[in-house]
């Protein structure tokens, strides 16, 4: 979203039309503008004998082209892990160092692009359902790394008394007024693409649509059992889910859309990584299972910014873009966190955090072709964070023409796994589910509206917010109607349902 945000709705519709025609390559990621420097290459090594993961994008979207690529994968000494014929994307594993060049040669003109999805070996190995020619390799276990993320500020609460009065965030965006009209429809489902939703939490146990829930962290293959989508090492998704849809049941808190349903779509592995194949699976499952809204409080690893002018990064970014566009075409609208680096998304120059699954990230030059995905993809609502005073949270990314709307994200009380309790977290990850919840109320009140209409109305209804000051990052520029900190303004739940 390096360009202005006003025409994004039109571009969303155009992208959906292109997918429908099966000419996805026309919308592929592009390079930097002529007056920008080329981004710094980050070579990714795929040595002989290491299980490496790849995405392969077909030139034309058709089952025949996908089958051609699948045969090429096998001929090149690889294994097909998952195919998505709807978007012309194949996920493959291989232990061959020359896999990329060989698969392109074997597929001839069927391949638009092929690239790695990680800078390290596949830690989970190849799924049992995929017949790997080299046997059941374990892959290489990697060291869990800390990336710029959200901050937990509290521990589990043991009290079962209602805590709605502590939810200043709901008051700020007029949720109580909205609830006088609707608390959400059980026919509307929100996909929480995250680390999983606690299925036993008293505020969430009745809110999860188990039939639509899915896990995507087994190399990008969907799995539907509870063990695949329940949280294991992180309560991030549980906290996000509480903001969206915690039940009004006399205990704990109340979510924005307690009358709707949520699907747990697990895209975060036990090391805390969200690789491209996981995200592709999550978006595709959202579209296939008829989810109306998704929340995406993450960026796709291992790059904080994926650069379209780099041949090793562009293919994975393209695969995620195709999945987002296709699911949007199915009627799913997506909200995403802007990020927690206090970065100006409209003025990209350098980055030193990627690849974050390696021991040593690379300091690199970046440009406008480099995108934080999924939040900077067309058709995704990009959400910045505000604090209790209505100012931009110091950690929040910003950028004129890059932010759509703002929502509360500092010291947000919501559900956590520890003790099936409640705790505080801060981050744009906490802001985005407020917008996902509002979109859920909007869909409940206006069931015939599609993604383009919903995004347009969400932005038009947002409360104009003048520039504020913050202790970190670029200063605010723009007008109260649209600026680099708040986009079109603070999201308004009441306006969304009227």
Indicate residue ranges for each PLM-predicted region.
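Active-site core segment of subtilase-fold serine proteases
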Residues: 148-259, 281, 287-315, 346-349, ...
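Extracellular S/T/G-rich loop segment that most often corresponds to the catalytic His/Ser-adjacent loop
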Residues: 357-444, 448, 456, 490-498
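Substrate-binding/access-modulating region of protease and related hydrolase catalytic domains
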Residues: 267-374, 418-433, 482
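Autoinhibitory propeptides
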Residues: 35-37, 42-44, 60-63, 67-165
